[in-house]
Amino acid sequence: MFSKIIQSYAKGNLIIQICAGIALGILIGINSKEISEIANLLGILFTSALKAIAPMLVFILILTSICTKDFSQSGVKIKNIIILYIVGTFLASACAILANFFFPVKLVLDGIQATTNPSPAHMGEIFKDLLFKIVDNPINALSSGNYLGILTWAIAGGAALKHCSNEAKQVFIDINEGVLKIVKFVVKLAPFGIFGLVANSVAQTGAQGLLSYTKLLILLVATMLFVTFVINALIVFFYTRKNPFPLIFICLRHSAFFAFFTRSSAANIPVNMALCAKLGIDKEFYGISIPLGATINMAGAAVTIAILSLTAANTVGIEISLLQAFLLSIIATFAASGASGVAGGSLLLIPLACSLFNIDYDIAMKVVAIGFIIGVIQDSVETALNSSTDVLFTAICSKNELNYNIK
């Protein structure tokens, strides 16, 4: 009987389960502060599990990605689309930073006061702090959650192992798969953790806490829509000198719609390939560009990482300099490309960006937990942007005469 319940839960729809957890958490938070305090243990366990797995996830994900990817077969078109993917992701992160400067959001977090570890004020201090974090001992970086150190050693390790044997690379691929399975297991427990977090948040902060979550969600979705209809439109126009919107709306109807519900760029690859075929793009090209885009084209993830990191900074009272904002754009671009194929991957990489501002690791993980609460909508919109942009950029780089008469 018990095993059947577990199997039924494991096969259930995560979105519905999270919604149920949110609704039940609000109900308990309003009616019983005592039960909310007990339920908060589930939230603490969930955030602790995320804190434990996140450093290892970032390290093995980036190391494996660098040492196993092979672009030796890349022709001019593939090189162009790689550049376009990176530029698009960078511009998306830059837009997210500007959006946060114009419409800053502060979260109501229980027990969080103004930071006692402020961000460095001068350029020299910033670079000194960055350098010491970068050259940190790799074991210490993993154990302390120093994501800049983790990132450095992952890149160095991936580059050093680039030319190792296929058998050795397979070992890292298998380890990567193992870590991803653990992450998927932890994420599958999100409804219980979110139930506890929401119950405690409502009991402690009332409607004000939920209102701050709503403002954050609106900012995220609005920024992603801006990237879709303004940034992507400008990229298409400058690349083709043609009206971008017919192609954009085709990509939204035939790619974004499905990606919104699957919440997975990888799962949407067959849909995107079928759309490319209907558009009249060469199979040899989209056969490489679409899977590649599902791996490195992560504009939506960059928006999520940048906005939630800056929201964490706003919450603890850190003022961000222009240099730090520029560095965040670069980090968000790189980190977003490592978020592919991971449920909630962009959320788990937020501590990496937060480390740029000396934000306490516990606070960063509380923001990650809030990301899971609003992720029911945020992750769907993020995936829709990521996946539809794969087709959009593939189409303009293909140089084929496109078929716009698609039903």
Swiss-Prot record:
Any GO BP annotation: serine transport
Record-linked Pfam families: SDF
Transmembrane segments: 10-30, 42-62, 81-101, 141-161, 179-199, 218-238, 245-267, 288-308, 316-336
InterPro entries according to UniProt: Na-dicarboxylate_symporter, Na:dicarbo_symporter_sf, Ser_Thr_transp_SstT
Keywords recorded for this protein, A-Z: Amino-acid transport, Cell inner membrane, Cell membrane, Membrane, Symport, Transmembrane, Transmembrane helix, Transport
GO MF annotation list: neutral L-amino acid:sodium symporter activity
Subcellular localization, as worded in the UniProt entry: Cell inner membrane
Catalytic activity: L-serine(in) + Na(+)(in) = L-serine(out) + Na(+)(out); L-threonine(in) + Na(+)(in) = L-threonine(out) + Na(+)(out)
Topology with respect to the bilayer: Multi-pass membrane protein
GO CC annotation: plasma membrane
Cross-referenced PANTHER family: PROTON/GLUTAMATE-ASPARTATE SYMPORTER, SERINE_THREONINE TRANSPORTER SSTT
Function in brief: Involved in the import of serine and threonine into the cell, with the concomitant import of sodium (symport system).
Protein family: Belongs to the dicarboxylate/amino acid:cation symporter (DAACS) (TC 2.A.23) family.
Protein name: Serine/threonine transporter SstT
Organism (species): Campylobacter jejuni subsp. doylei (strain ATCC BAA-1458 / RM4099 / 269.97)
